Amino acid sequence: MRIAQEEIFGPTTSLLRVTSFEEAVRVANGIEYGLSCAIFTRDVNQAFRAMRDLQTGITYINAGTTGAEVHLPFGGTKATGNGHREAGQAALDVFTEWKSIYVDYSGKLQRAQIDNVES
């Protein structure tokens, strides 16, 4: 199915008929993309299996994939995205660079902090 092989952005809804949960997971995971997916179920065990088995950056349970939740790390798997999570706390590592600075105003030569030899 072409619809299950392309990454679609836009106001599109695709419905595919499958005969089992396992087939649905195979279809969803059988493409090269993995940005997001959604499953609607009243079965909590099925929801947890979906969370475990679906190969996407974000899995929605009983909610549509209308966009990333800004408080959650957002990004895809496989051929989707750029390999980074672009929201939530994980965005700090994507959009910032750590820099450590040590300043000593004592004017004295300091022993290394790992030097435990008595003077």
Residue ranges of predicted features:
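Conserved C-terminal structural/oligomerization subdomain of aldehyde/semialdehyde dehydrogenase
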Residues: 1-119
